[in-house]
Design a protein with these regions (language model features):
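FMN-binding flavodoxin-like domain, especially the glycine-rich phosphate-binding loop
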Residues: 1-42, 86-102, 112-223
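Terminal amphipathic helices with adjacent charged low-complexity linkers/tails
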Residues: 34-68
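A short acidic (Asp/Glu
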Residues: 47-48, 82, 167
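Short gly/ser/thr-rich secondary-structure transition/capping motifs
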Residues: 53, 101-107
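Conserved beta-strand elements of the Class I
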Residues: 68-72, 155
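Short, charged N-terminal beta->alpha structural module
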Residues: 72-93
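Cofactor-binding loop segments of dinucleotide-utilizing enzymes, especially the Rossmann-like FAD-
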Residues: 73-76, 104, 158-159
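Flexible, glycine-rich phosphate/dinucleotide-binding loops
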Residues: 78, 108, 163
Length: 223
């Protein structure tokens, strides 16, 4: 049930991390026989109760559980999708095993948010549309902001044909609207379809992400 428990927590309770930690610490000294939530399974044994307590304590700290990369992209004609797939390919070549790739136009944001919470790194890719960030990516970032998402590492790739706005918009969001977010690598702005001369830029970004993954330490919250 862990995946669905995380999806419920991050999308419904995620905004209220400090309150969750306070509540857990207040009851941590009590002898709890069972937890019967409105959603999900009933936790009946000391082992499962301790397990879900520690999960909620960790999730409410807004820190990742595992090293890995979530690639979230929006694409109008398939060009940004191709770039996202190339990023995944280059990361795989460098030995990164935990890679999740999502089309923000097709996947419910709750699933992407759950994995963004779980993994240390995220890559966001989107095109410019009407001199703004592509709406489905704008919505995804808005959802993350509303849930107080923080303490993660993100890389950014914009895509445009005539005028560029997506890359700058995503950089502004993650540097101004979120707490403790680290931009990994140089934000990229690819013009139209992915071309041969763009590959070194993608490869360099993959190098930077892999180096950041290797340097990242996972901290586990304690009661």
């Amino acid at each position: 049930y862990e995946e669905e428990a995380r999806r419920y927590y991050t999308n419904i309770v995620g905004k209220y991390g400090p309150q969750v930690q306070n509540a857990i610490r207040k009851v941590s000294g009590l002898e709890i026989k069972r937890i019967a939530p409105l959603h999900g399974p009933i936790w009946r044994t000391p082992e499962t109760i301790e397990y879900i307590f520690h999960k909620y304590l960790h999730w409410s700290s807004y820190t990742a559980e595992k090293k890995g990369v979530v690639i979230a992209f929006g694409s109008m004609y398939g060009n940004t999708r191709d770039i996202a797939q190339q990023v995944a390919k280059q990361l795989s070549f460098r030995g990164v095993e935990d890679i999740k790739i999502y089309d923000v136009s097709k996947t419910n944001p709750s699933y992407i948010i759950s994995d963004a919470w779980k993994y240390t790194h995220m890559v966001c890719l989107a095109p410019t549309y009407n001199l703004n960030l592509y709406l489905t990516m704008e919505n995804f970032i808005h959802e993350l902001k509303a849930l107080n998402f923080q303490n993660h590492k993100v890389s950014i790739i914009g895509n445009h044909s005539w005028a560029s706005a997506a890359m700058k918009s995503m950089v502004a969001h993650f540097t101004e609207d979120f707490k403790n977010m680290e931009i990994v690598g140089e934000p990229l702005d690819i013009k139209s379809s992915l071309k041969e001369e763009d590959l070194p830029l993608i490869e360099k970004l993959a190098d930077d992400i892999k180096a950041s993954l290797d340097e990242t330490v996972i901290f586990h919250a304690k009661l």
